[in-house]
A protein has these predicted regions:
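Active-site "cap" helix and flanking loop/linker of ATP-utilizing ligase/carboxylase catalytic domains
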Residues: 233-254, 260, 269-329
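ATP-binding N-terminal substructure of ATP-dependent carboxylate-amine bond-forming enzymes
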Residues: 1-95, 126, 348-353, 357-362, ...
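N-terminal functional module of multi-domain proteins
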Residues: 442-522, 527
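Peripheral (often C-terminal) accessory segments that flank ATP-dependent C-N-forming ligase machineries
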Residues: 128, 295-397
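Internal nucleotide-binding/catalytic subdomain
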Residues: 154-263, 272
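A conserved helix-loop-beta module that forms one wall/lid of the active-site cleft
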Residues: 84-151, 158
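An N-cap/entry alpha-helix motif that binds or orients negatively charged groups
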Residues: 398-477, 729, 735-748
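Alpha/beta enzyme core
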Residues: 536, 548-664, 671-694
Length: 748
């Protein structure tokens, strides 16, 4: 059982499988890379100790577990708890806690006479000031319960204490901090394996620490270039620390400072190192698979031969860009062909906002090289950095032009990113970004909007209109939300990962002060990706599910949305004949009034029916108990030759206004378009394709930028029509200029 399913756990998962073992992987993120490799993936936070023990016991009854470990995560306590609960090889839980909590760790070292800095536990700013007074400057403040240099900062004088305290506090899950002496000197990172109390040191690397007053590791060199006697003395100190922490079986990773007073322990963890050392640079340098040794020990077996097969130099160096927004990334595949380059990991994607790093988790990427000499390895990294192009633009340079250019490059022939997104020149249909059949329904949405023109009012005192609104108790900066879109591969041609898309839209909407609707998709498992995005952002979104033939499948998705903390849920009830569902062989069917009532009764969340196009269905939505409806023809994607949503809005408003919230989508592209819909009685507007284009182009930053642009346009339109608030927008500010031949159905 491997606790943690991130990138750094993949090598140990793969090694275990090569050893003929079945691997259970637990991680909070169901889409974590390691979960894809797992034989048995289990969604569980690595920090949830009780939950991890519970699922381990349950799984143990089905598939007996023979060992448990982690690599590169701060989950040693979870590993120990599971091992103790299942009577597996491991260390005591209290020892694992001491190897995780920096205050308990320092206390153990003090009690056993292990060289380490003097320290004080800190809870309040007053505590911090007292500690600084006793220790003297410089000191280091850090969370007692985090890793990756998060919240770690040097304090050089009393004027820096308050800001440093706040910075460290923000990175501490518990709020507990530690202040300790600053140790000047070269730093080593050392891995060791321990079996029956016998310690075997494996990799010893030189750490490169930069970006003061923070402590950002920008790389390491394997093996260390320090004299052997210095390395040996560091190992002796680490061995004393291992004994003090009670690590008699398993692995240990130490950060050792070579100070003027001799080696001192900075950190010591009951696991192998992260930072690409134990899993990448060590085996490249020595030919020894340390993951195999860790697995053998976790199974209670003596590790195999750990003698190096050769002695090469392997280095890891961080890719750090200038601050700004990632515009494009290219030439990574070409850079991998440079002699000596073993691996390249890119942590950012277009649209990500990057800043000057303050911790080890804020780097744009990593390069791993191997050669016979340090000079050759460094030269390979230099060439690699010169070739890789991570183009950054300043936030001030962000514009719809830069967003659209980036999106056009990524979407290629799926979407031309036309200047006017109105369906007239679409590159694709369904699947894709276009409309069904001839695309007439998609086009009609835009044409229907053009039937209405604005009638200005300019003698008034409105200078700063209030665009705010609210839905189901959620404050909105303006009554516009992202429409549900799914199918990153099916509809967007793989231009963006499905989870990345959902995250970009949810985060972008939140940054703009509104919320996103999320799609279900034809793939029966795809809804879980939307749920993951909701989990990450506190449920700030509204998932819309397909009208699947089996109502239990709909209710299952609703329950998942409840668990994710969703604001509301809904169903795009018009997707009863939909091409992408047919392609995936997913059964859908219309819902009767009684079925709708049954589905709605299954949840306490507000329920939205999307796909209403006539007063009759609107009235039945009210009768079913829906809290909101969306006037929508599915972006013209379910049927050709449909009327536009603005063609029917007034009739629906007359039928159900005051009984249900009324939303609308379909061709809305500008603040003026939004004003028209609000004037005719819609309370909220959903926008789909332009938001998707922004998300593909430059991620959440672009989504937020686009939505804020719409809000600014709406404000200008409100000023020119004398509307101080959203409630002041009335039908007398629009005029219909074309005859509309649509006749609403008579309700009998």
């Amino acid at each position: 059982m491997v606790i943690g399913g991130g990138l750094l756990q993949v090598p140990v998962i793969q090694t275990a499988q090569k050893m003929g073992l079945r691997v259970i992987v637990t991680d909070y993120n169901p889409n974590a890379l390691g979960m894809k490799y797992a034989d048995i993936p289990i969604v569980m936070s690595t920090r949830d100790i009780e939950g991890s023990v519970r699922v381990a016991k349950k799984q143990h009854e089905i598939t007996p577990i023979s060992g448990v470990l982690t690599v590169g995560t701060d989950a040693s306590a979870t590993v120990a708890a599971v091992a103790n609960a299942l009577n597996l090889p491991g260390i005591k839980f209290e020892d694992a806690i001491a190897a995780t909590n920096k205050i308990k760790m320092r206390t153990r070292f003090f009690e056993h006479g292990v060289p380490s800095p003097h320290f004080f536990p800190v809870w309040s700013l007053s505590d911090a000031k007292k500690a600084c007074k006793v220790l003297g400057f410089p000191v280091v403040i850090k969370p007692s319960d985090n890793m990756g240099a998060r919240g770690v900062v040097r304090i050089d004088n009393k004027n820096q204490i308050a800001d440093a305290f706040a910075f460290a506090k923000s990175a501490s899950p518990s709020g507990e901090l530690i202040i300790e002496e600053f140790m000047e000197g070269h730093e080593l990172s050392i891995d060791a394996v321990v079996f029956n109390g016998e310690v075997t040191f494996t990799g010893i690397a030189d750490r490169v620490i930069e970006y003061p007053p923070h402590f950002v590791e920008t790389g390491h060199t394997m093996p260390s270039q320090l004299p052997k006697e210095m390395q040996d003395s560091a190992c002796e100190v680490m061995k004393a620390g291992i004994k003090a922490l009670g690590i008699h079986l398993g692995c240990a990773k130490g950060d050792i400072k070579i100070t003027k007073d001799g080696p001192k322990i900075g950190e010591l963890a009951a696991r192998l190192s992260g930072g690409f050392m134990s899993a990448y640079t060590y085996p490249l340098s020595t030919g020894v698979n340390l993951m195999r040794a860790a697995i053998e020990i976790a199974l209670g077996q003596e590790p195999g031969n750990l003698e190096p097969l050769y002695n090469r130099v392997s280095i890891e160096r961080a890719i750090i860009t200038r601050p700004g927004i990632v515009k494009k990334i290219c030439c990574v595949e070409e850079a991998l062909k440079i002699p000596g380059i073993a691996e390249i990991f890119i942590n950012v994607k277009p649209g990500d906002k990057v800043k000057k790093p303050t911790s080890n988790v804020e780097k744009a990427g990593h390069i791993i090289a191997v050669a016979d000499t340090l000079e050759e390895a460094e030269d390979a990294v230099r060439k690699c950095k010169e070739m890789i192009n991570i183009e950054i633009c300043d936030e001030s340079e962000l514009s719809m032009d830069t967003i659209n250019i980036s999106a056009r490059e990524r979407l290629r022939k799926v979407c031309y990113v036309c200047k006017q997104c109105n369906g007239k020149d679409c590159a694709s249909g369904v699947p894709g970004m276009g409309g069904a059949g001839s695309g007439a329904s998609f086009k009609r949405n835009s044409e229907a909007l053009l039937n209405y023109k604005i009638n200005t009012r300019v003698i008034h005192d409105v200078t700063n209109p209030d665009t705010s609104s609210s839905l189901f108790g959620i404050h909105l900066s303006f009554p516009v939300m992202a429409a549900p879109i799914t199918g990153a591969v099916t509809n967007l041609g793989g231009a963006i990962d499905e989870l990345d898309y959902n995250i970009a839209v949810v985060k972008g909407c939140m940054d703009a002060g509104t919320i996103a609707f999320l799609g279900d998709g034809a793939d029966p498992e795809k809804y879980k990706i939307a749920m993951e995005a909701l989990h990450q952002f506190g449920g700030m979104g509204i998932p819309i599910f397909k009208p699947r033939a089996n109502n239990d499948e709909i209710i299952k998705r609703i329950k998942a949305a409840e668990e994710a903390g969703a604001v509301a849920v809904g169903m795009d009830i018009d997707a009863i004949v939909f091409k992408t569902m047919e392609l995936k062989h997913q059964a859908v069917k219309p819902k009767s009034l009684s079925e709708l009532k049954s589905i709605l009764s299954s949840t306490h969340l507000p329920f939205i029916l999307k796909g209403i196009m006539n007063p009759r269905d609107a009235a039945m939505a009210v009768e079913a108990g829906a809290h909101a409806l969306v006037v929508s023809n599915h972006g013209g994607r379910v049927l050709d030759e449909m009327v536009g949503t603005m063609d029917v809005l007034e009739d629906i408003v007359r039928e159900v206004r005051g009984h249900i919230h009324i939303l609308i989508d379909g061709g809305f592209r500008t603040g003026v378009d939004i004003l028209k819909a609000l004037a005719l009685g819609a309370e909220y507007v959903l926008i789909g394709r332009p938001v998707a284009i922004a998300a593909v182009g430059m991620g959440s930053e672009a989504v937020a930028y686009y939505l804020k642009t719409l809000q600014a346009e709406l404000k200008k339109a409100m000023i020119l029509t004398g509307c101080a608030t959203i409630n002041d927008i009335t039908s007398d500010i629009v005029r219909k200029i074309h005859h509309n031949s649509y006749q609403p159905l008579e309700i009998r």
